Amino acid sequence: MNKEQLEKMTNGKGFIAALDQSGGSTPKALKEYGVNEDEYSNDDEMFQLVHDMRTRVVTSPSFSPDKILGAILFEQTMDREVEGKYTGDYLADKGVVPFLKVDKGLAEQQNGVQLMKPIDDLDDTLDRAVERHIFGTKMRSNILELNEQGIKDVVEQQFEFAKKIIAKGLVPIIEPEVNINAKDKAEIEEVLKAELKKGLDALNDDQLVMLKLTIPTKANLYKELADHPNVVRVVVLSGGYSRDEANKLLKDNDELIASFSRALASDLRASQSQEEFDKALGDAVDSIYDASVNKN
């Protein structure tokens, strides 16, 4: 593990950019960027277009390591190059800590939750991530209803994978998303917090994780988790809120920082001039940085 990157992730001021839309969500991400499905005829062309979009983001002067601590990549992005370097190396050289999304998507809903699908090639993927100088990983589950067994299952599965990831020298981001429209969102979050605390308490001193959570209904609910000795940082997802709304809610939560995807890229368009693009990205970065660093 890179100690300098660990120090940056633990104490740095800023947020994490989530650039990890994968196969399923790529057409939607491209459409929002202004690239329609009739502009590519197969997956290779689609992934090239999305890589071009991400390259435009990470090479922009607005994508500044003074405000962006890390970036989460999709597996394809890790294996591609930006300006002649593997994406992870490009980011690290720029001062941005690279993470890799390792999950294979969500299973069908059961007990009010969606567990992760099996990750059969996890070992190989992690070995490649280490080779590509990736610092950590991210994997997402989804909680839709107040069901204690379901929530317990989500957390257990996350920690089971997390331990394998830690064993390879990487820092896992555990992401049990709570759907922002869930009927009992506040109660779900209380149960989730208790289960996460159990999982964290069972780790050895040297087993470090990060958490990526939905912004809680009750402000500062996750402060205890952020202060846990095994937690490097707690980051939050935008989860379907607009950027302004997500930023407003984030400001009420001390110690939590953003890890936004759609809320970061929502004003970016393929048709923008470089100047317009840099300004739109810069405005988004500034507002998300402000919500991550300057609290109410």
UniProtKB/Swiss-Prot annotation:
Reactions it catalyzes: beta-D-fructose 1,6-bisphosphate = D-glyceraldehyde 3-phosphate + dihydroxyacetone phosphate
This enzyme's EC code(s): 4.1.2.13
Enzyme category, top tier: lyase
Any coiled-coil regions, as ranges: none
InterPro entries, sorted: Aldolase_TIM, FBA_I, FBA_I_Gram+-type
UniProt pathway annotation: Carbohydrate degradation; glycolysis; D-glyceraldehyde 3-phosphate and glycerone phosphate from D-glucose: step 4/4
One Gene Ontology biological process: glycolytic process
GO MF annotation: an example: fructose-bisphosphate aldolase activity
Gene3D superfamilies for this protein: Aldolase class I
Record key words, sorted: Glycolysis, Lyase, Schiff base
Active-site residues, Swiss-Prot/TrEMBL: E175, K212
Pfam families according to UniProt: Glycolytic
Membership in a protein family: Belongs to the class I fructose-bisphosphate aldolase family.
PANTHER family attached to this UniProt entry: FRUCTOSE-BISPHOSPHATE ALDOLASE
Full protein name: Fructose-bisphosphate aldolase class 1
Organism: Staphylococcus haemolyticus (strain JCSC1435)
